[in-house]
């Protein structure tokens, strides 16, 4: 075994099993690509991304940890989001929440 190595069973893994999900259409109205990371509070992403922002409060992308989705200028796509778990405290990002989600 290599130090830090993690051995797992073979096969694919399903992420966030049993978690509620929402799908939302997102469009990049800006003139530059925008990349959003796996754990970024979607409600607080770049303002050039157009979507029903209020519906995404307390949600993040349903993608593998440490990965991201890139939105090219003019691109529209549907993304899947999952709610934050645990204490549901959101601090940082654009500073729009700064505390516990309701």
Curated annotation (Swiss-Prot):
Pfam families: Urease_beta. Its EC number is 3.5.1.5. The keyword Hydrolase applies. It is found in: Cytoplasm. The keyword Transcription does not apply. InterPro entries: Urease_beta-like, Urease_betasu_sf, Urease_subunit. Heterotrimer of UreA (gamma), UreB (beta) and UreC (alpha) subunits. Three heterotrimers associate to form the active enzyme. HAMAP family: Urease_beta. This is Urease subunit beta. The lineage of its organism: Bacteria, Pseudomonadati, Pseudomonadota, Gammaproteobacteria, Alteromonadales. The gene is ureB.
């Amino acid at each position: 075994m290599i130090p830090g190595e993690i051995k797992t069973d073979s096969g694919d893994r399903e992420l966030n099993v049993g978690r509620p999900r929402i799908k939302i259409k997102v469009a990049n109205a800006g003139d530059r690509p925008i990349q959003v990371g796996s754990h970024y509070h979607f409600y607080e992403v770049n303002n050039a991304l157009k979507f029903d922002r209020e519906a995404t409060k307390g949600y993040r992308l349903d993608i593998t940890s440490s990965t991201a989705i890139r939105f090219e200028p003019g691109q529209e796509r549907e993304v899947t989001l999952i709610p934050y778990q645990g204490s549901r405290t959101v601090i940082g990002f654009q500073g729009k929440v700064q505390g516990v989600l309701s």
